[in-house]
């Protein structure tokens, strides 16, 4: 097994320079073997910018494309529900079940990719404690 190179401390000058250089490069482009729909590209950009550039590997980028698509599908389903309502012909709109499944899939993918709120911001008790300081 190939050892993973040790990362620089987040509070080091080298890490700060790397972060600035990575931010200047903008979002990572999808690899050739990954398809990201045009309408999902802003979602892709937000996802890949949520983690340091040097932490992404090809397997993660594949999952990131699935997450961007799930977010795009969720927006489409929400618009459909807004247009047609939660109830259609006295039954629950089938789009509601699809939206629920897409949301669950997106949450699982976000956790797996470590781009969820707990991974990027911290636990809610820590956020609450930090906001009390402001």
Where do the protein language model's features map onto the residues?
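An amphipathic, hydrophobic-aromatic interaction surface with interspersed Lys/Arg
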Residues: 30-84
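Amphipathic alpha-helical protein-protein interaction segments
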Residues: 65-128, 132-134
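Non-transmembrane, interaction-prone segments in cytosolic or luminal domains
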Residues: 27, 34-43, 58-60, 89, ...
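Arg/Lys-rich, low-complexity, intrinsically disordered N-terminal tails that contact nucleic acids
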Residues: 1-45, 119-134
